[in-house]
Regions:
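Feature activates predominantly on carbohydrate-active enzymes
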Residues: 95-263
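Acidic, contiguous N-terminal accessory segments
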Residues: 2, 6-156, 249, 254, ...
Protein backbone atom coordinates (compact mmCIF):
# COMPACT_ATOMS: atom_id res chain seq x y z
CA UNK A 1 0.00 0.00 0.00
CA UNK A 2 2.76 2.43 0.96
CA UNK A 3 4.67 1.55 -2.20
CA UNK A 4 1.62 2.25 -4.39
CA UNK A 5 1.03 5.54 -2.60
CA UNK A 6 4.67 6.49 -3.19
CA UNK A 7 4.36 5.83 -6.93
CA UNK A 8 1.22 7.97 -7.16
CA UNK A 9 2.99 10.73 -5.24
CA UNK A 10 5.93 10.70 -7.69
CA UNK A 11 3.56 10.84 -10.67
CA UNK A 12 1.69 13.75 -9.08
CA UNK A 13 4.96 15.64 -8.51
CA UNK A 14 6.01 15.07 -12.14
CA UNK A 15 2.67 16.41 -13.38
CA UNK A 16 2.92 19.50 -11.17
CA UNK A 17 6.51 20.17 -12.26
CA UNK A 18 5.47 19.87 -15.91
CA UNK A 19 2.60 22.30 -15.36
CA UNK A 20 4.75 24.97 -13.76
CA UNK A 21 7.79 24.68 -16.02
CA UNK A 22 8.02 27.49 -18.60
CA UNK A 23 7.28 26.63 -22.23
CA UNK A 24 10.28 25.40 -24.17
CA UNK A 25 11.61 28.28 -26.23
CA UNK A 26 11.51 27.84 -30.01
CA UNK A 27 14.89 27.62 -31.72
CA UNK A 28 14.58 30.88 -33.64
CA UNK A 29 17.25 33.57 -34.05
CA UNK A 30 16.61 36.33 -33.19
CA UNK A 31 14.18 35.17 -30.52
CA UNK A 32 10.61 36.40 -31.20
CA UNK A 33 9.04 39.20 -29.20
CA UNK A 34 6.26 36.85 -28.09
CA UNK A 35 5.80 33.10 -28.51
CA UNK A 36 3.37 30.62 -26.97
CA UNK A 37 3.73 26.89 -27.59
CA UNK A 38 0.71 24.79 -28.49
CA UNK A 39 -0.06 21.11 -28.91
CA UNK A 40 0.57 19.23 -32.11
CA UNK A 41 2.64 19.81 -35.24
CA UNK A 42 1.86 20.99 -38.73
CA UNK A 43 3.29 18.68 -41.41
CA UNK A 44 4.37 19.85 -44.86
CA UNK A 45 3.76 17.25 -47.58
CA UNK A 46 2.84 16.88 -51.25
CA UNK A 47 -0.73 17.97 -50.52
CA UNK A 48 0.27 21.24 -48.81
CA UNK A 49 -1.45 24.20 -50.46
CA UNK A 50 -0.52 27.84 -49.83
CA UNK A 51 -3.07 30.59 -50.40
CA UNK A 52 -1.79 34.12 -51.07
CA UNK A 53 -3.60 37.37 -51.84
CA UNK A 54 -1.41 38.57 -54.70
CA UNK A 55 1.67 37.85 -56.79
CA UNK A 56 4.03 39.69 -54.43
CA UNK A 57 3.05 37.33 -51.63
CA UNK A 58 3.44 34.40 -54.03
CA UNK A 59 7.06 35.41 -54.69
CA UNK A 60 7.75 35.36 -50.95
CA UNK A 61 6.06 31.98 -50.50
CA UNK A 62 8.11 30.63 -53.41
CA UNK A 63 11.31 31.29 -51.43
CA UNK A 64 10.11 28.59 -49.02
CA UNK A 65 8.61 26.15 -51.52
CA UNK A 66 11.82 26.15 -53.57
CA UNK A 67 13.62 24.78 -50.51
CA UNK A 68 11.20 21.84 -50.41
CA UNK A 69 11.80 21.16 -54.09
CA UNK A 70 15.50 20.57 -53.42
CA UNK A 71 15.46 18.90 -50.01
CA UNK A 72 12.10 17.11 -49.83
CA UNK A 73 11.48 16.21 -53.46
CA UNK A 74 8.05 17.88 -53.53
CA UNK A 75 6.88 21.45 -54.02
CA UNK A 76 3.93 22.86 -52.03
CA UNK A 77 1.48 24.48 -54.43
CA UNK A 78 0.80 28.22 -54.31
CA UNK A 79 -2.55 29.66 -55.40
CA UNK A 80 -4.23 33.04 -55.11
CA UNK A 81 -7.26 33.19 -52.79
CA UNK A 82 -7.84 29.43 -52.52
CA UNK A 83 -10.20 28.41 -49.70
CA UNK A 84 -8.85 24.84 -49.67
CA UNK A 85 -5.40 25.98 -48.56
CA UNK A 86 -3.85 24.92 -45.26
CA UNK A 87 -1.29 27.76 -45.24
CA UNK A 88 -2.89 31.18 -45.54
CA UNK A 89 -1.37 34.64 -46.09
CA UNK A 90 -3.62 37.39 -44.76
CA UNK A 91 -2.93 41.13 -44.73
CA UNK A 92 -3.44 42.81 -41.36
CA UNK A 93 -2.98 46.58 -41.56
CA UNK A 94 -2.92 46.89 -37.77
CA UNK A 95 0.49 45.22 -37.60
CA UNK A 96 3.53 47.50 -37.84
CA UNK A 97 5.90 47.31 -40.81
CA UNK A 98 8.25 44.27 -40.59
CA UNK A 99 6.03 42.73 -37.88
CA UNK A 100 4.12 39.50 -38.39
CA UNK A 101 1.87 37.07 -36.56
CA UNK A 102 2.27 33.34 -37.10
CA UNK A 103 -0.33 30.87 -35.85
CA UNK A 104 0.68 27.23 -36.33
CA UNK A 105 -1.91 24.50 -35.69
CA UNK A 106 -1.94 20.84 -36.80
CA UNK A 107 -4.50 21.59 -39.53
CA UNK A 108 -3.29 24.95 -40.83
CA UNK A 109 -0.83 27.86 -40.61
CA UNK A 110 -2.13 31.43 -40.62
CA UNK A 111 0.39 34.16 -41.47
CA UNK A 112 -0.55 37.81 -40.90
CA UNK A 113 1.46 40.90 -41.79
CA UNK A 114 0.85 44.41 -43.05
CA UNK A 115 3.21 44.13 -46.00
CA UNK A 116 5.97 42.33 -47.87
CA UNK A 117 8.61 42.57 -45.14
CA UNK A 118 6.45 41.00 -42.46
CA UNK A 119 5.46 38.07 -44.68
CA UNK A 120 9.09 37.53 -45.68
CA UNK A 121 10.28 37.41 -42.06
CA UNK A 122 7.47 35.01 -41.20
CA UNK A 123 8.83 32.69 -43.90
CA UNK A 124 12.30 32.90 -42.36
CA UNK A 125 10.85 31.92 -38.98
CA UNK A 126 9.14 28.90 -40.55
CA UNK A 127 12.48 27.98 -42.10
CA UNK A 128 14.03 27.97 -38.61
CA UNK A 129 11.22 25.81 -37.21
CA UNK A 130 11.55 23.19 -39.95
CA UNK A 131 14.16 20.41 -39.65
CA UNK A 132 17.67 21.68 -40.57
CA UNK A 133 17.61 19.38 -43.61
CA UNK A 134 15.32 21.92 -45.31
CA UNK A 135 18.51 23.77 -46.30
CA UNK A 136 19.99 20.76 -48.12
CA UNK A 137 20.71 21.15 -51.81
CA UNK A 138 19.87 17.48 -52.47
CA UNK A 139 16.88 15.37 -51.54
CA UNK A 140 16.80 13.89 -48.03
CA UNK A 141 14.92 10.69 -47.23
CA UNK A 142 12.94 9.69 -44.12
CA UNK A 143 12.29 13.21 -42.83
CA UNK A 144 9.04 14.39 -41.28
CA UNK A 145 8.71 18.01 -42.35
CA UNK A 146 7.03 19.18 -39.16
CA UNK A 147 6.84 22.58 -37.50
CA UNK A 148 5.69 22.73 -33.85
CA UNK A 149 2.34 24.22 -32.95
CA UNK A 150 2.67 27.74 -31.57
CA UNK A 151 1.61 31.36 -31.88
CA UNK A 152 4.31 33.94 -32.59
CA UNK A 153 4.06 37.72 -32.63
CA UNK A 154 7.32 39.21 -33.78
CA UNK A 155 9.01 42.29 -35.18
CA UNK A 156 12.47 43.88 -35.19
CA UNK A 157 13.90 45.45 -32.06
CA UNK A 158 16.16 47.68 -34.18
CA UNK A 159 15.38 49.40 -37.48
CA UNK A 160 18.93 48.91 -38.86
CA UNK A 161 20.34 45.39 -38.54
CA UNK A 162 23.68 45.55 -40.28
CA UNK A 163 26.58 43.28 -41.20
CA UNK A 164 29.81 44.74 -42.63
CA UNK A 165 32.13 42.73 -44.87
CA UNK A 166 35.70 43.96 -45.35
CA UNK A 167 36.18 42.57 -48.83
CA UNK A 168 40.01 42.79 -49.09
CA UNK A 169 40.23 40.32 -46.20
CA UNK A 170 37.22 38.15 -47.06
CA UNK A 171 38.58 34.78 -48.14
CA UNK A 172 35.40 33.35 -49.64
CA UNK A 173 34.20 32.87 -53.19
CA UNK A 174 31.38 34.84 -54.78
CA UNK A 175 29.07 31.80 -54.55
CA UNK A 176 29.81 31.45 -50.86
CA UNK A 177 29.14 35.13 -50.38
CA UNK A 178 25.69 34.68 -51.91
CA UNK A 179 25.09 31.79 -49.51
CA UNK A 180 26.14 34.08 -46.67
CA UNK A 181 23.64 36.72 -47.82
CA UNK A 182 20.92 34.06 -47.82
CA UNK A 183 21.73 33.11 -44.23
CA UNK A 184 21.83 36.76 -43.17
CA UNK A 185 18.26 37.03 -44.45
CA UNK A 186 17.28 34.10 -42.21
CA UNK A 187 18.60 36.13 -39.27
CA UNK A 188 16.47 39.08 -40.47
CA UNK A 189 19.51 41.26 -41.21
CA UNK A 190 18.37 44.15 -43.42
CA UNK A 191 21.59 45.98 -44.38
CA UNK A 192 24.90 44.78 -45.78
CA UNK A 193 27.98 47.02 -45.91
CA UNK A 194 30.94 46.24 -48.17
CA UNK A 195 34.07 48.11 -47.07
CA UNK A 196 37.00 48.53 -49.44
CA UNK A 197 39.74 50.16 -47.38
CA UNK A 198 43.04 48.30 -47.61
CA UNK A 199 45.48 49.31 -44.87
CA UNK A 200 48.68 48.20 -46.61
CA UNK A 201 50.57 51.52 -46.48
CA UNK A 202 51.62 51.12 -42.83
CA UNK A 203 54.00 48.47 -41.44
CA UNK A 204 51.06 46.96 -39.55
CA UNK A 205 48.95 46.86 -42.69
CA UNK A 206 51.73 45.29 -44.73
CA UNK A 207 52.25 42.62 -42.08
CA UNK A 208 48.52 41.91 -42.00
CA UNK A 209 48.45 41.44 -45.77
CA UNK A 210 51.49 39.17 -45.57
CA UNK A 211 49.88 37.05 -42.85
CA UNK A 212 46.64 36.83 -44.83
CA UNK A 213 48.49 35.67 -47.93
CA UNK A 214 50.37 33.01 -45.95
CA UNK A 215 47.14 31.80 -44.37
CA UNK A 216 45.34 31.71 -47.71
CA UNK A 217 48.21 29.80 -49.29
CA UNK A 218 48.22 27.22 -46.48
CA UNK A 219 44.46 26.69 -46.93
CA UNK A 220 44.70 26.74 -50.74
CA UNK A 221 42.47 29.82 -50.92
CA UNK A 222 42.87 32.44 -53.62
CA UNK A 223 42.64 35.92 -52.12
CA UNK A 224 41.99 37.72 -55.40
CA UNK A 225 38.59 36.05 -55.78
CA UNK A 226 36.91 39.02 -57.47
CA UNK A 227 34.54 39.94 -54.64
CA UNK A 228 36.04 43.43 -54.36
CA UNK A 229 35.25 44.52 -57.91
CA UNK A 230 32.47 47.06 -58.17
CA UNK A 231 30.65 45.20 -60.95
CA UNK A 232 30.74 41.95 -58.93
CA UNK A 233 29.27 43.57 -55.83
CA UNK A 234 26.61 45.30 -57.91
CA UNK A 235 25.66 41.88 -59.31
CA UNK A 236 24.64 40.81 -55.79
CA UNK A 237 22.13 43.65 -55.40
CA UNK A 238 19.09 41.94 -57.01
CA UNK A 239 19.84 38.81 -54.94
CA UNK A 240 20.01 40.97 -51.81
CA UNK A 241 16.82 42.83 -52.70
CA UNK A 242 14.90 39.56 -52.99
CA UNK A 243 15.94 38.88 -49.40
CA UNK A 244 15.14 42.41 -48.21
CA UNK A 245 18.79 43.25 -47.54
CA UNK A 246 19.37 46.81 -48.66
CA UNK A 247 22.31 49.03 -49.51
CA UNK A 248 23.22 52.71 -49.18
CA UNK A 249 24.45 54.78 -52.13
CA UNK A 250 27.22 53.46 -54.35
CA UNK A 251 30.24 55.74 -54.28
CA UNK A 252 31.39 57.20 -57.58
CA UNK A 253 34.50 55.09 -57.94
CA UNK A 254 35.89 53.51 -61.07
CA UNK A 255 36.36 49.77 -61.42
CA UNK A 256 40.16 49.97 -61.65
CA UNK A 257 40.33 51.28 -58.09
CA UNK A 258 37.93 48.54 -56.96
CA UNK A 259 36.04 51.25 -55.13
CA UNK A 260 32.81 50.55 -53.34
CA UNK A 261 31.80 52.20 -50.09
CA UNK A 262 28.82 53.31 -48.03
CA UNK A 263 26.93 50.06 -48.57
Amino acid sequence: MLRTTGIYFIILVMILVKCFLPDEKPEIIPFPLQSVSDKGDFTFNKATLISVENEKQAMIARELTDLFTLSAGFTPEIKIQDKRANIIFRTDRELAAEHYKLNIAPSCILIKASGQKGFFYAMQTLRFLLPPAINNQTQVENIQWNVPGMTILDGPRYSNRTVAIHTPFTLISKDNLKELIDHLAMLKINRLHFTQEVHDTTPEGQQKMKDMNLYAKSKKITISNGTTHTHDIISYLPFQAERLIWKANISDCDEDKKGYSNI
